[in-house]
């Protein structure tokens, strides 16, 4: 497949917490869709190795959710570094989207961009500076048309790939039910 500037890159990170100054990335996943939100390809889903000491610093919420999902065990067993994750992800993305063409797409994507700026700058620079943030639409629909919100429910697994898939499905829902296009 040739790279297409109209394709969209969807990304999700799982982190040890919400503060990039003290927390780190522990999982990354990407998907590429066409402009109509049809999934074209799944990128590598990578658990990034972190030390036991780093993982022990996670708060209770993160310990619980990342423990239940099996992510903590995958991170401990992983041999992948942040550099490996950057390299593999960019290699995948370059097949589908030229550098600088796609906005960063996902839910609460500003948070992911903060961590990419801190830990994975080369990957962050692959994206256009704009964002397609599904959570922005969700917040507006919640306020302007709350009854519409009943039509879509997320599982909230806090696993990067599943979260991206849900973000795409959520935007497809808003496109049909809110934008009617």
Swiss-Prot record:
Cellular component terms per the entry's GO annotation: cytoplasm
Domain Exonuclease: start-end pairs: 8-171
One example of a Gene Ontology biological process annotation: DNA metabolic process
Localization in the cell: Cytoplasm
Keywords on record: Cytoplasm, Exonuclease, Hydrolase, Nuclease
GO MF: 3'-5'-RNA exonuclease activity; nucleic acid binding
Principal location class: cytoplasm
Keyword Hydrolase assigned: yes
Protein EC: 3.1.15.-
Keyword Iron among UniProt keywords: no
Function: 3'-to-5' exoribonuclease specific for small oligoribonucleotides.
Family stated for the protein in its record: Belongs to the oligoribonuclease family.
NCBIfam families referenced in this protein's UniProt entry, alphabetically: PRK05359.1
This protein's name: Oligoribonuclease
């Amino acid at each position: 497949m040739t790279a297409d500037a109209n394709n969209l890159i969807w990304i999700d990170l799982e982190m040890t917490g919400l503060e990039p100054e003290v927390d780190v990335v522990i999982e990354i996943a990407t998907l590429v869709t066409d402009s109509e939100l049809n999934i074209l390809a799944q990128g590598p889903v990578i658990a990034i190795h972190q030390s036991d000491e780093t993982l022990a610093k996670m708060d209770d919420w993160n310990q619980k959710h990342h423990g239940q999902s099996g992510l903590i065990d995958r991170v401990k067993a992983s041999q992948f570094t942040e550099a490996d994750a950057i390299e593999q992800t960019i290699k995948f993305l370059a097949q589908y989207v030229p550098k600088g063409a796609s906005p960063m797409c996902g839910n609460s994507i500003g948070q992911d961009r903060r961590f990419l700026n801190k830990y994975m700058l080369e990957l962050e620079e692959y994206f256009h500076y704009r964002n397609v943030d599904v959570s922005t639409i969700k917040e507006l629909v919640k306020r302007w048309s709350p009854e519409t919100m009943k039509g879509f429910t997320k599982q909230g697994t806090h696993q990067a790939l599943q979260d991206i898939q849900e973000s795409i499905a959520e935007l497809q829902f808003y496109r049909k039910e809110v934008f009617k296009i």
